[in-house]
Amino acid sequence: MKVISNFQNKKILILGLAKSGEAAAKLLTKLGALVTVNDSKPFDQNPAAQALLEEGIKVICGSHPVELLDENFEYMVKNPGIPYDNPMVKRALAKEIPILTEVELAYFVSEAPIIGITGSNGKTTTTTMIADVLNAGGQSALLSGNIGYPASKVVQKAIAGDTLVMELSSFQLVGVNAFRPHIAVITNLMPTHLDYHGSFEDYVAAKWMIQAQMTESDYLILNANQEISATLAKTTKATVIPFSTQKVVDGAYLNDGILYFKEQAIIAATDLGVPGSHNIENALATIAVAKLSGIADDIIAQCLSHFGGVKHRLQRVGQIKDITFYNDSKSTNILATQKALSGFDNSRLILIAGGLDRGNEFDDLVPDLLGLKQMIILGESAERMKRAANKAEVSYLEARSVAEATELAFKLAQTGDTILLSPANASWDMYPNFEVRGDEFLATFDCLRGDA
């Protein structure tokens, strides 16, 4: 970590804790800043604030008092989840207090080069794939960012010989100014988080900030399947490396079932460790990064063939009596489940789906359900899911929980079948989040395996 004097004796307000705010507070304190942390969660319910107070950091909890900004702060570090129309943020902007993001703070002190990955879908899987391939190739890749490891914490241990492989959300990117990765990946761009950004155009603008400071000596990897990529590519100074599953490009591409970089065949799509058309795209982006990083083709192929997915993201859980289980609890919308289904033989597939509907068009799912062996339906959206199943002429059963659904699916399954949890709905009608929903699937698998 670089020891910089930019924040020495500067009064800095950390707005919002969570993992990133806590990490930023500790880093800035180490750099000699005079830190105040403000979090909306009450102090007695806030272990992170309690821990920071024990370290001598000033904490103010329970609300966001606008008058706090009258204390002449020289910087604000804003939690990514707090929007820019928040009264505290608006007041800071009115007072011309510079607002930093936690990832930019990490960038300022990082000795290690950064590979940044953003996009609407596939960020976590691609980030993990890239780190796995780089590490297998003898490099030292450190996961950081939106993947659960705050960048400002990871950077404190990183050295010049490391590489920070950083997952970046639109929330994290919208406020960056100086941030400059050496390699950036945009997996795809879909209309999501519009409640935060206001419009698709503003959402894309936030994602596009990943390349704002890049030069021709840096590399920007874009999804050439999307027309918007061609438009955006004309506006960057970075060297663009495209990837595509639909056409041959001057980068990474799929042709006749083989994944290539330039003219070099790397791996057959059927040899990838995770199924689905979206995972071919993720693998192509990974191949582009790996080749730019000097990783040998055989290492890339070996890693991609053994990659088992990320937890809750089309995760291959295992087999019981030659019946394979996949946990795709992260699929909370129709598009995600459609992509998951693309990797399987429907005639041997039992799909567990349903949950809280957030405006899905279930008719869009009907073509992807055709030929399914069976559906197990659950949750608030059950009646709409049943109508989709009927239109696809797929038989179904109803369950009251993921555990019950998994047990039913296993009773119906035969040797060679696959059981897939890919809900196409949010979890909040039955579970606090998709992780808890997926964990119940994993726990039920463990019980079934123990009884087998």
Curated annotation (Swiss-Prot):
Pfam families: Mur_ligase_C, Mur_ligase_M, MurD-like_N. It is found in: Cytoplasm. GO terms for biological process: cell division; cell wall organization; peptidoglycan biosynthetic process; regulation of cell shape. Its EC number is 6.3.2.9. Keywords: ATP-binding, Cell cycle, Cell division, Cell shape, Cell wall biogenesis/degradation, Cytoplasm, Ligase, Nucleotide-binding, Peptidoglycan synthesis. It comes from the Bacteria. The keyword Mitochondrion does not apply. GO terms for molecular function: ATP binding; UDP-N-acetylmuramoylalanine-D-glutamate ligase activity. ATP binds at residues 119-125. Its main location: cytoplasm. The keyword Cytoplasm applies. It catalyses: UDP-N-acetyl-alpha-D-muramoyl-L-alanine + D-glutamate + ATP = UDP-N-acetyl-alpha-D-muramoyl-L-alanyl-D-glutamate + ADP + phosphate + H(+). Pathway: Cell wall biogenesis; peptidoglycan biosynthesis. One of its GO terms (cellular component) is cytoplasm. HAMAP family: MurD. Cell wall formation. Catalyzes the addition of glutamate to the nucleotide precursor UDP-N-acetylmuramoyl-L-alanine (UMA). Belongs to the MurCDEF family. This is UDP-N-acetylmuramoylalanine--D-glutamate ligase. The gene is murD.
